[in-house]
């Protein structure tokens, strides 16, 4: 124990500032037998001002279940302040008791922070970042908020040091925007990501996307989203549109004056949407076959559009058949069993191993798709929607970090062929390879349950990544301008249909109608995205398309500030000085900078506005 104390205890440099509560703390090790060890720690002061807590890989006990990293500042008495998490959730520091625990594998960013009247700090997990959760416990009005590393869930030996850097924030940066900017600046300085402005240079496909709305159209899908269907039986297929129908839809979009649209064909492949991936061919005759698909792609390009498709590299089904289905190639759990993902439209899905994806079929798939004439950024389902899954297959083992590296290799290959990579949810282990997130938010989705300590969301991810990754806020704000209906959304949140999905309405009342959903897109700097509707009318899409035109350049700009100006009124300020103010009130206008923001309305303040 004395040796361990020496390893983890550090000396603070003379430049350290006293009184932040970040200089000292402790590391707590929970062992699988129930024993726990508390080790006092003095943080190392880094050149960038961070207070660093480190536990070397060699000093992480292999019998540990958890390791907590807890500075003194992690203990906060109930006060007028708030906490935030890397999945955008926040809560006021006004409770007497309660517990919040992030779900492992669904924290978009490895950051967390606290703001009180006395201090503001942000923590960034820089080592073993794929293996921790956030733990927030409140008892007798005292909060304890810290990262917990789940050592027993790694499935391999710990593969890197635990490193957590804490930054004290002051002045105009002493808020959640400052927390997100601190994280963004660190990512930019280390070259982890590059601004979108730089990446579009010499990349016409990505440049097109940056000025286009995203329109996804589903032609067909399997109807096997049920445990009642035998695990490996071919489910029935619902045919919705042919390629001839799709051509007519694109013509209607063009006729309405929507010139900048990223067209993405969904459900085009063998057995339709969520059919037996990774098998893509033959293109179903019911849709018109491959020649009709090539014709539709060529027609869309003749209208001036960029054309892309939806695929899935994350899931594999037995129904894909030989030679794609080979049990030696599937992701394997620690017990040696094939990892099942769950029941999707195509039936029971298994996890792929991305080493196999890269080495077996990705290159040939991309080559075939390119030969069909596709020229838009490529959309790949799931990959950035969850953390990487470890694999214990003897021929292709990988821990989470190694699997993330293989995922990034797929991004590199896709970018080399199509200019950009699109996926969903924005888990930022994929940030270096991600160009577009179909949605970001976890509120009301499968990823995060409700908790008594959560009061809402703030655009933490958007502040960190707007100007780097294109996005729109939530699953619920896809088709924002369309009336989707409460019943349809509630049906998807029925736990009997999909384990883990929780009621959206409790925390997202304001997102149930087109007006509120559209305001959320503008508030969060979103790129309008359309997918779940049948496009029986294009008027709502056209309305949102037109509204976005004066603001669409903001996809290139960093967000520097986000504020609550009044009840139900919020302001977003970009680095170029431009602002958007949204008013969620049903009946109260709000005056700002010489303009009146109408109830359920917004105002854009471009450069030169008084």
How does the language model describe each region?
Residues 8-17:
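Hydrophobic h-region of N-terminal signal peptides that target proteins for export
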Residues 19-268, 285-287, 299, 303-306, ...:
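Carbohydrate-recognition beta-sandwich/jelly-roll modules
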Residues 12, 187-190, 471:
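Short, flexible helical or helix-coil boundary motifs
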